[in-house]
Amino acid sequence: MTTRTEAVKAYLLDLQDRICSALETFETDTRFIEDAWTRPAGGGGRTRVIENGSVIEKGGVNFSHVFGSGLPPSASAHRPELAGRGFEALGVSLVIHPHNPHVPTSHANVRFFIAEKEGEEPVWWFGGGFDLTPYYGNEEDCIHWHRVAEQACAPFGPDVYSRYKAWCDTYFHIKHRNEPRGIGGLFFDDLNEWDFDTCFAFIRAIGDAYIDAYLPIVQRRKAMAYTEQQRQFQEFRRGRYVEFNLVYDRGTLFGLQSGGRTESILMSLPPQVRWSYDWKAEVGSEEARLTDYFLQDRDWLGLTAPKAAV
């Protein structure tokens, strides 16, 4: 393991610790359980899962460090020059599914790949980002989420936020539904346009920003009253989340195709989901407003949160 890889690994392990500790502040008795695992083909990780808390219905914060003699098709398909190289892949990936339909689901991921071949220079890149999936939208939350994202990107260039926001909107699009998974955030991959130290600093900025972006939203919404109808709508929309993760998500496909640990890969799936045949929201309802307003390509930084928002 190179010095660079060691530095990335140390940061990712610390990030996992800090995120778990921050999320546990919302729970009285429930804590993350840790499952350390080893990958027979090389590497391993530590999966941390929290279930049936008072605020978090299910959440997972996973660290993995795996390696192998060749990249799986999901990783090399868009970069064929990497075929036949050995690889190391390190990352922290998390998904939080709250009980309350007024609290959005959040996802974040930061990762590092290095691909090597004898007689050639190593090829490395970073990837990651974070995105938010509300069920009952709130402008204040959307603006806050994107403002934190923009502030994390600002030191690295005036167009970084706008580029990675657009990439996020494109990536988290459910093609067979022709709708986005949520209100976006940041997404990037194959990042090596700067030197290693700058790219690593950027990854740290994004990883650290997740806590600042998500925790205030949870704090504002976790005690809001909700109805059984709203809970059912949350479960219905969770179905979209499952569809995206199992059909399109690059990380899920990479993990499964590279012989990754299935339990850790699928920890992102919500505990309860609902599919209703050809269900449509009532025109003018809160449920309809989610798709008609919030799940639209929007410049959230150009809006001002309504004064009455709670």
UniProtKB/Swiss-Prot annotation:
A divalent metal cation binds at H97, H107, H146, H176. One of its GO terms (cellular component) is cytoplasm. GO terms for molecular function: coproporphyrinogen oxidase activity; metal ion binding; protein homodimerization activity. InterPro entries: Coprogen_oxidase_aer (IPR001260), Coprogen_oxidase_aer_sf (IPR036406), Coprogen_oxidase_CS (IPR018375). Pfam families: Coprogen_oxidas. Substrate binds at S93, N109, V110, R111, G259, G260, R261. Keywords: Cytoplasm, Heme biosynthesis, Metal-binding, Oxidoreductase, Porphyrin biosynthesis. It catalyses: coproporphyrinogen III + O2 + 2 H(+) = protoporphyrinogen IX + 2 CO2 + 2 H2O. It is found in: Cytoplasm. One of its GO terms (biological process) is protoporphyrinogen IX biosynthetic process. The record marks H176 as: Important for dimerization. Its cofactor is a divalent metal cation. Belongs to the aerobic coproporphyrinogen-III oxidase family. This is Oxygen-dependent coproporphyrinogen-III oxidase. It comes from Pseudomonas fluorescens (strain SBW25). The lineage of its organism: Bacteria, Pseudomonadati, Pseudomonadota, Gammaproteobacteria, Pseudomonadales.
